């Protein structure tokens, strides 16, 4: 007796050659409905229509096609169970050996910004039911949910009876497929209706098993979305990305995105930006009138820490920039585009990872960030609030000069991406000194100011949190700081304001804090 395969797919990739092999090499009968049945019949593949098989028509505009005892009985029946055998005979059930189903393209539908009603109609009901039934009864039934599985199924079938371990793997992938589908639907409803969910559910496919985590003794895996973010970035050269590379690339790119992001020379001359990053903290950043100048200025801040670092650009990398990059040991360079001549120069360094991250691969701003804690997960909105400089308040008698204001804005954007407590000293829109990850603000200030002293004198100071005391202002004055930007909000703000007035320093409150842990 010929085995029966139920085939109902939205993604019709490779379905014709696959079903042809099922019929011609393994003597399968094909059971199908709707668009899939039509597609197969047009290719001259014999098909039994579901409506004929169940003796029940599609109803409710196609909403009900396969939700029928003849379908699910044929899938769920346990072949060796005596009670099931009686039902099989009593209800004349024909056993289904293979279920090939993938689902309505719900994710693609909502990504296009479809209407609520259109999205609802793209919620598959029959498909997940068949997949789950087959996966539950995987001892007797095989289930395929993705075209990438077809060839492996053919090869396994050539060996004879399918192994239980292979069928169990198919069942696992099937349940993960429906879980991912339901996650997409529930998250869409939550976002569309602005609802607070009682459960946090996300679904990310495995991209790659990494060599190790932060340290060689730690296992690590990379999960992500297929069409956006780092998985869609194009690696033009270099060894595979490590766990630490990915963390640093994320921080570097997030920082440089503060200044716009264009593949070609569409930026204004004031917004070519470069960031050098090490151990998840910027160690140098600058805006210049070219990518090359921005990089060289960023390098001046801390050329020692730049060794083995990550460099990010917000504009095209040309040959001049590549020449400046090639003499420094770097782990990765990321930019929206690279000139062919620049790539030739950079590829001389065989181990350098070169990544092209296009503008359209940047996720939208409505993202969340997560951190694992013992027994749980912390979830928050990403810190990507748009800063409105018109809401900033100068709280001192002295106002920042035009140049100081530009530097304050620049330093504030960089400070947001540095581990707290964070202090940034900047002048002419380049960092002179950075104090990161210190347990007190004065300690971070000392590190940043001392580094700045080696790179120049004066400039502005940015702090990611408020000043609990006036001591940071006093210290800043000793190093010639002209202006300060900070959130404000301390019960001792007046002390810091008075000290600024006494020392002739201007100070701006943003009313926004940017802690980063």
Curated annotation (Swiss-Prot):
Keyword line: Hydrolase, Multifunctional enzyme, Purine biosynthesis, Transferase
Keyword Ubl conjugation in record: no
InterPro entries given in the database record: AICAR_Tfase_dup_dom_sf, Cytidine_deaminase-like, MGS-like_dom, MGS-like_dom_sf, PurH-like
Family named by the database record: Belongs to the PurH family.
Comment text on domains: The IMP cyclohydrolase activity resides in the N-terminal region.
Lineage: Bacteria, Bacillati, Cyanobacteriota, Cyanophyceae, Synechococcales
Pfam families, per the entry: AICARFT_IMPCHas, MGS
Superkingdom of this protein's organism: Bacteria
Biological pathway: Purine metabolism; IMP biosynthesis via de novo pathway; 5-formamido-1-(5-phospho-D-ribosyl)imidazole-4-carboxamide from 5-amino-1-(5-phospho-D-ribosyl)imidazole-4-carboxamide (10-formyl THF route): step 1/1; Purine metabolism; IMP biosynthesis via de novo pathway; IMP from 5-formamido-1-(5-phospho-D-ribosyl)imidazole-4-carboxamide: step 1/1
SMART domains the record matches: AICARFT_IMPCHas, MGS
Catalytic reaction annotation: (6R)-10-formyltetrahydrofolate + 5-amino-1-(5-phospho-beta-D-ribosyl)imidazole-4-carboxamide = 5-formamido-1-(5-phospho-D-ribosyl)imidazole-4-carboxamide + (6S)-5,6,7,8-tetrahydrofolate; IMP + H2O = 5-formamido-1-(5-phospho-D-ribosyl)imidazole-4-carboxamide
Keyword Transmembrane among record annotations: no
MGS-like domain: residues covered: 1-145
A biological process from GO: 'de novo' IMP biosynthetic process
GO MF, any single term: IMP cyclohydrolase activity
One of the record's GO cellular component terms: cytosol
Signal peptide (from-to): none
EC number: 2.1.2.3, 3.5.4.10
Protein name per its UniProtKB record: Bifunctional purine biosynthesis protein PurH
